[in-house]
Amino acid sequence: MVRFTSPPNSQVFNTRVWEIVRQIPSGQVTSYGQIAAMIPPPQGMDPKSYDAFAARWVGGAMAVCPEGVPWQRVINAQGKPSLRVGAQEQRKLLEEEGVNFNEKGRVDPKICGWSGPSPEWLSQHGLFPPPGFGH
């Protein structure tokens, strides 16, 4: 397997990530992996290699997202804010949106998991439907 530390075209990938994240409604969350699953692999990259790196690339995109992207709505696969600077702020912002955390600090995706953009929006943007996150 080839090692990719960043997407072949970071700006294009990051922009797609931010477009998706802007679609997440207030009070709902999704994971890095869910977002990655919506974005097709870059040209010339096999799907298996893409699957190995894509969620990390989404994390990288979120670390540099511009103002106005609701970054707090993207959590890790365990249903928690990421372990990084800003995790407490992320939780606070989500709670202000009505997202509840259990005693282990996790969000229940069955309650507030986002099922993804509309099929029309996905088609218009050349994206895949996400696998079920909590649904």
Regions found by a protein language model. Name each.
Residues 2-135:
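Nucleic acid-binding interface residues in structured DNA/RNA-binding domains
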